[in-house]
Amino acid sequence: MVMDSSKWWWIGNHNTTNFSPWLHSTLSELDEKTKEMLRVIDEDADSFAARAEMYYKKRPELIAMVEEFYRSHRSLAERYDLLRPSSVHKHGSDSESHEKSSTCDESSWSEACETHEEYAESEIDNGESKWVDESEIDGIVEEIEPSEVVYSEGNGNSEMMKIEIERLREENKVYSEMVREKDEEKREAIRQMSVAIQMLKEENSELKKRVTNTVVARRNKEGGDSQRKQQMWKPFEFKKIKLEGLWGKGFGNWALPNTDSTSKELMTL
């Protein structure tokens, strides 16, 4: 009865898999309240005249008001859910549809939550409906829209920051790989230089040994030559002749002895 063809504007049975728990609860409560108001409207009167009066006078007006109330309230709830900073509402993602969202205890949103709770708890009392003025709803929506734009821009900046961070991470990986390759090249060059230095040290040590052996051999050779020269000069040494007895006797007195004997002695020399 409530869901007949005349209520084409009813969005019931909506897909709430991607909504936050808060929005899902709010919309469910809204559906129940709307059904209750329509039930009151569709109640049969005691007499035919009363039913006719209700049908022709009140019913169209009440249905229009319920329609307006339902659309405004639903739109406001969806917009408010988008503005909540800790909302996990994410369209097109089924993997995050069951994440927890924060309640209305944040200081920056407590006043708005309280206003919404008071507004959502409004109900029909003693057969009289409590309606929200359309101008009031429009004012609230106008206040919300700039915040929504700022929030959307913030989300765009956040996405840009995420993209930039991802790009920087990729560049960091590339640079790290380049540094690693350079370090490997340096280590290989150091290993090659170490091998070359070791070979030079060994060659230097071998050359030192050869030079030392050559010097020792040359010194030994020079020592042997000097000894041979000394041995070669020994046969040529002259014997000293003492002529003291021969000349002192004749020249000391300025007179020569017997000529014949003297000449014989000289001949002997």
From Swiss-Prot:
Coiled coil (UniProt feature): 155-214
Subcellular location: Cytoplasm, Cytoskeleton; Nucleus membrane
InterPro entries: NAB (IPR011684), NET_actin-binding_domain (IPR051861)
Record keywords, A-Z: Coiled coil, Cytoplasm, Cytoskeleton, Membrane, Nucleus
Protein name: Protein NETWORKED 3A
Function, in words: Plant-specific actin binding protein. May be part of a membrane-cytoskeletal adapter complex.
UniProt family annotation: Belongs to the NET family.
Keyword Cytoplasm belongs to the record: yes
Domain NAB: 6-87
GO cellular component, as recorded: cytoskeleton; nuclear membrane; vacuolar membrane
Main localisation: cytoplasm
Bias type Basic and acidic residues, positions: 91-103
Annotated segments matching region Disordered: 87-113
Keyword Membrane tagged: yes
UniProt remark on domains: The NAB domain, also called NAB (NET actin-binding) domain, is sufficient for F-actin binding.
Molecular-function GO term, any one: actin binding
PANTHER family: PROTEIN NETWORKED 3A-RELATED (PTHR32258:SF28), PROTEIN NETWORKED 4A (PTHR32258)
